[in-house]
Amino acid sequence: MIIYINDKPCNAKVGDLLLNTAKLNKAHIGYICGGNGICQSCFVYVLEGAECLSEPGEDEKAFISDKLFAEGGRLACRTTIVKEGTIRVLTRAEKFRRIVLGLNVPGFITYAQTIGYNVTNKLPSGVSSIVSRVQSGRLNPVDTIGKIASGLSPASQLVYNNFIEAFPFMQAPVNMVSGVAKSAIDNASGALCTISGGRLHLPGSTCTAHDKPAEAIERITISAK
């Protein structure tokens, strides 16, 4: 069967963990703690196919708030494919990337509020869950440290690859970068123009709505005697 991680088609089968599917298909899902369910770097949003996945367990409930569950939030290292169907997931990093590149200010505010709510309300239960698992023998600290160490190298490479994919102009010649940077400034100014009702623009930008370079807030004349 084919599932989609950040819109990338990935081969999978019933019984697979979402995290393992991502690894095998070189899709972007973080895995710093090696699948021990403590770092939350494998957090994903299930956009479609929640009924094809296992029910959230206690480890997930300890870290994920009701708000994030309502948005389809899951930990990929704790989520198993239980039946065939259409499954689409979006990683937290990819969702944030799309919000930033799309200059979605309201979306960013909502995103930040939800994440802040989750940290504030679930941090105590998350820590309690880790302590409980260590005490019961379900979590081996030595093994966990080893998994973190082995996962840092591929994880850092994955971050680099996805950064270059998200911002390809970083590999371009300087003259090309300047053009891309100007375009980014114009886009940001356009968003500011829309939000402010046309009253504000970024200095040096070109607003498509007004079709003229934005003026600096204040002009300063410097003369030498």
From Swiss-Prot:
[2Fe-2S] cluster binds at C33, C39, C42, C77. Keywords: 2Fe-2S, Chlorosome, Electron transport, Iron, Iron-sulfur, Metal-binding, Photosynthesis, Transport. Residues 1-95 form the 2Fe-2S ferredoxin-type domain. GO terms for biological process: photosynthesis. It is found in: Chlorosome. Its cofactor is [2Fe-2S] cluster. Binds 1 [2Fe-2S] cluster per subunit. Pfam families: Fer2 (PF00111). It comes from the Bacteria. One of its GO terms (molecular function) is 2 iron, 2 sulfur cluster binding. The keyword Oxidoreductase does not apply. The keyword Endoplasmic reticulum does not apply. GO terms for cellular component: chlorosome. Could play a direct role in the oxidation or reduction of the quenching species formed in the chlorosome. This is Chlorosome protein J. It comes from Chlorobaculum tepidum (strain ATCC 49652 / DSM 12025 / NBRC 103806 / TLS).
